Amino acid sequence: MQPSSGMTLGQALKAADLVGSGGEAKVVIQGGEVRVNGEVETRRGRRLIEGDVVEVGDERLEVR
C-alpha cells in the first residue's frame, strides 16, 4: 500500500510493509534510518503531506 497524505510517518512505514509493527517503526525512525524529503526524521508522529518522499535504506516512497 502506498502511504497517503495525513498519515503519520510510523503509519506510512507499516502501510508500505517496510516494518512489521509500530514498535519496529519506532526503533527504525528513532535510530535515524528514515529520511523525509532528504532530511533525517526522528518523529514517528510526523504527519505526511502529498508530495513528501520517504526513504528507508534503498526503499523510496512518495506520498499521494
Model-found features: residue ranges?
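Short, charged beta-turn/beta-strand-edge "cap" motif at the junction between a beta-strand
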Residues: D58-V63
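A basic, amphipathic helix-loop patch mediating RNA/tRNA/ribosome contacts
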Residues: S5-R47
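Short amphipathic
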Residues: M1-P3
